[in-house]
Swiss-Prot record:
Listed name of the protein: Co-chaperonin GroES
SMART domains membership: Cpn10
One Gene Ontology cellular component: cytoplasm
Domain of life: Bacteria
Upper taxonomic lineage: Bacteria, Pseudomonadati, Pseudomonadota, Alphaproteobacteria, Acetobacterales
Length: 104
């Protein structure tokens, strides 16, 4: 099944939470919080402004984003847990993550 969001909605896949702390302590599943970081899978065409013109979204598929703890609606599409949220629920785009992983 292919899903295409409408208006200013965005489909997000949560990124896995860290298994260990910086000090090397392993975090058990029961103590983990849901991650507030994700990857944009699909975006809608945008919302309409007062003049009726479609305003494109700032995020695009593949962007790594940060969102609020209670943002979005959890759905299951093709057996995968995803979130559908409005663009306004997104706090920002995380840039430069590839270089961060290389340095670690």
């Amino acid at each position: 099944m292919k899903f295409r969001p409408l208006h200013d909605r965005v489909v997000v896949r949560r990124l896995n939470a860290e298994e260990k702390t910086a000090g090397g302590i392993i975090i058990p599943d029961t103590a983990k919080e849901k991650p507030m970081e994700g990857e944009v899978i699909a975006v809608g065409p945008g919302a309409r402004n007062e003049a009726g013109a479609v305003v494109a979204l700032d995020v695009k598929a593949g962007d790594r984003i940060l969102f609020g703890k209670w943002s979005g609606t959890e759905v299951k599409i093709d057996g995968e847990e995803l979130l559908i949220m409005k663009e306004s629920d997104i706090m920002g785009i995380i840039e430069g993550t590839a270089s961060k992983k290389k340095a670690a």
